[in-house]
Amino acid sequence: FGTSAASALGVSLALTKLIKLPISPLKAGQYAHIVEVSLGTGLGDVIAEMEKGLVLRIKPGAPGYGECEIINTNNDLYIITKTLSGLKTKDIITNPKEKEKITNVGLKMEEKFIKLPSINTFLNYSYQFAEQTELLNSKVKKVIDDLNTKTFGASMAMLGNTAFAITDNISEIDTDEYAISKLYTDGIKYL
């Protein structure tokens, strides 16, 4: 979900405005990135959250240093999710063996995705990533299998026991069982 990045970014932007710091939104994003990575709650989702819609991070780093490519989407899209339980991100990304596996598989999937970036290939390679890193468990897989019959495709959110899917048609989605969010493609909103 990028919850830790969103929280760090929200706090950074809010404090900047609240105490009238002479800091740009870009600089606030850079501070949020440092907090997220140094606390071990994520590996740099802030930059993606400061972009628009579905993005591919093509160069790691904080906003202003890293780079993202926006994946164009023609339709109104919805993200469908179901969370079964949490995972401690820090326990996984600070384990050298797990981090190496995640990095190696991630680079392989990224290389494939860059050749043909689309919603369908994103979902396909995301699922392959979850399987090959051995983060996917049978309970999340069961939810993914159900979502695959109603959407463009489904995978596992990183890092958590959460299934997600993307669709342009939510008529077959049980709103009592799944959370539904519209993909916002206009970029970050500053209030």
Regions found by a protein language model. Give the residues of each.
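DPxDG-like acidic metal-binding loop motif
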Residues: G2-P25
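Charge-rich, low-aromatic oligomerization/scaffolding segments with amphipathic character
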Residues: I173-D176
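ATP-dependent small-molecule kinase catalytic core of the GHMP/sugar-kinase superfamily
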Residues: K27-K141, D145, D168-N169, A179-L191
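Short beta-strand
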Residues: A154-A157
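Short cationic amphipathic helices and targeting signals
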Residues: L159-T167
